[in-house]
């Protein structure tokens, strides 16, 4: 029976990374270890409630505002209502997800260049 060992050593040391890569990795760790992450799209709607006596039924009056987060899950579009109390936190979590995705894109490009044989451009 042949035994294989899995090395948990990093592919390269921190000192071998460019300053840009160290900064990107550091920010990614901050985002992952800090507050929440939420993947989806922020949607704000204006709608009437349907009551004839409500201000939203009057022409020219402001309608009711509601906020939702949409995302694809298992091939289906799902929506989640966001209350007024949750809006600031939810927006921040969506922003964290977007920032993390941008960081990953930049790291993927650095590593793509490394595999390609050239050193990554900073």
Indicate where each model-derived feature is located.
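A positively charged, amphipathic N-terminal helix/segment that binds anionic biomolecules
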Residues: 1-122
């Amino acid at each position: 029976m042949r035994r294989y060992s899995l090395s948990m050593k990093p592919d390269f040391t921190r000192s071998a990374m460019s300053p840009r890569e160290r900064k990107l990795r550091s920010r990614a760790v901050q985002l992952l270890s800090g507050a929440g992450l939420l993947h989806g799209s922020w949607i704000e709607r204006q709608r009437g409630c349907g009551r004839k006596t409500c201000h939203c039924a009057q022409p020219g009056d402001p309608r009711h505002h509601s906020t939702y987060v949409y995302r694809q899950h298992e091939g289906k579009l799902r929506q989640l209502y966001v209350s007024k109390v949750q809006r600031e936190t939810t927006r921040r979590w969506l922003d964290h997800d977007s920032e993390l995705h941008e960081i990953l894109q930049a790291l993927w490009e650095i590593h793509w260049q490394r595999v390609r044989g050239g050193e990554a451009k900073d």
